[in-house]
Amino acid sequence: MSISYEETGRRSQKARTRAALVEAARELLTRGRTPTVEEAAIAASVSRATAYRYFANQQALLVAAHPEVETASLLGMDAPSDPEERLDAVVTALARIFLDAEQSYRTMLRLSLETGSDRGELSLRKGRRYLWIRDALAPLRDRLPRAELDRLVHAIAVAIGIEALVTLVDLAGLSRRRAVEVMRWSARALLRSALAESAVPTR
């Protein structure tokens, strides 16, 4: 079984070097750049050869530089019980996460669309959006059949993701504030439609 470079000797020093490379990449991303391993190495004052021991390619670096949001819920301790209010709070919080690190999220979106990308890590990160939506809709677990709830989660995920934000801003020409308003409206509309549909008796 092979051992990674970072797991051999001088781990503290290697952890600091890796952190410096990641921070350099994040700083470059905030400036609108899509940093290569070489560019991050220069910015972090690390040799090119050393940088490649930590990140084999640009994608590995960019995945590491992507901001981590580890929380299992975007709702606070005093979260409302109403599903629509909960969903709106999650959409608003998620939009703020996107806007605070927009360039990084745009980069991850581009990577996910590139042919030949390693989708394992990318898919794992995108999956958090679904967890947060399910958390918002938790009060509906006993109200909607599992299949209908799953369909609603998928529909909302499409309407409020970074993909939606990029489309509304870049293609529709909306301001970011207006784009977020549309995302919130879309989520509410989908929820109300699902609830109305479930209330209609089947023949």
Per-region residue spans from a language model:
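Amphipathic alpha-helical linker/stalk segments
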Residues: E27-T34, V63-V90
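Hydrophobic/aromatic-rich alpha-helical bundle segments in the mid-to-C-terminal region
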Residues: L140-S186, A194-R203
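Amphipathic alpha-helical packing segments from all-alpha helical-bundle domains
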Residues: R96, D100, G116-R146, D150-H154, ...
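Amphipathic alpha-helical segments used for helix-helix packing
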Residues: A65-V69, L99-G120, R134-D135, V166-T167
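Basic, helix-initiating cap at the start of DNA-binding domains
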Residues: M1-V46, Q59-A60
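Key DNA-contact positions within bacterial/archaeal DNA-binding proteins
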Residues: A49
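Hydrophobic alpha-helical connector segments
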Residues: A43, L75-Q103, S123-K126
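HTH DNA-binding helix-turn interface
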Residues: Y52-V63
